[in-house]
Structure formats: structure tokens, C-alpha cells
């Protein structure tokens, strides 16, 4: 059997990043030959965490839409389309080189471009979404119709996601469940 190649995309915050890492850990523990490539944002928490975790990753120059009318927010929103275009080109190169069998999106602005590239007419790569919140975020809502399955943390009824939901709970990294109480207090 060929090696399974999976892209796990998500980040911006720990709520999207750490479930992505937990999913990757679990997949590798079940099939060590699987190749996983993480995709996140240069501006998210993953920019610090991925190098520490020593995982194969790419950071996109993407940033989320800024709400509010502050000057800095308006400048960032003006630049956003250019960041999206750069992220699309970078992401296409990753897909052409890596040729993933599946893409898992854990939400947040960092997963939108990788999911968009996966689901375009040329690629048609199957996607799975993982939603940690009781109400789906924007990225989950945008890609729900194209997803093969949507793994949810909470067993809530949601009209947008009917028929595709698998109640999995929140993915938790092994270091969290197998931690030592003493070192937890220390850190």
C-alpha cells in the first residue's frame, strides 16, 4: 500500500492548532508510514509551535479579516487580498509537490486557503473538517457542503451540517492525557 499523504490545515489560535497536532499524532500512532504536512499562518501561534514540535510544515502569509474601524485594521484588510493570492500560489505548490490524498481542516483563517485549493474543480481532494466549537465557525460553514465528514466536539444539532457529522469529541494530544501532575504544576 502506498504511503498515505495528509495535509492538516488550521491555526491562528491554539483552539485550532492543538487539535490539528493531536489529530496528526493519532494518525501517526496508528499508521507510522503516513506522511503529514501541516499548514498554518505566519501570524498564528503555529509559527512558534511548529518549529518546537519539529513537524513538517508550511506557513502561509495569511491573516484573518480584521473587524472594527481602527486604522491598523483597515490597512490589514486592504492588504488581505494580496496575502490571499500569495497564499494560494504557495499552497498550490505544496499540493503539486506533496500530492495529498486527503486534507483535514481544523478551522480558523489558516485552513481556508488549503481547503479552497483541495476542493477546486482541478484537484477534488477529499476534505474532512474538525469543529471544536458548539457552533461551527466560518470556515466550517463555507466548506461543509464539500466535506466528506465533519467531526464535531459537541453533540449539538446543526442544520448546516446534517448528514455529515461524526461526534468525535475534541482531539487531545497524548502529552495532555499522560502528563505528570508534578511537572504540570511546575510549568
Predicted regions and their residues:
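Conserved nucleotide-sugar phosphate-binding/catalytic loop shared by glycosyltransferases and other
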Residues: 3-13, 33-84, 168
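Short amphipathic alpha-helix
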Residues: 16-27
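Glycine-rich, highly charged phosphate/nucleotide-binding loops
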Residues: 77-93, 184-185
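Active-site-proximal region of nucleotide-activated glycan assembly enzymes
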Residues: 2, 37, 56, 119-186
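Residue-level detector of alpha-helix initiation sites
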Residues: 13-14, 108-110, 134-135
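An aromatic- and histidine-rich active-site surface loop
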Residues: 43-47, 100-121
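Residue-level signature of catalytic and energy-coupling elements of molecular machines
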Residues: 15, 50, 107, 150
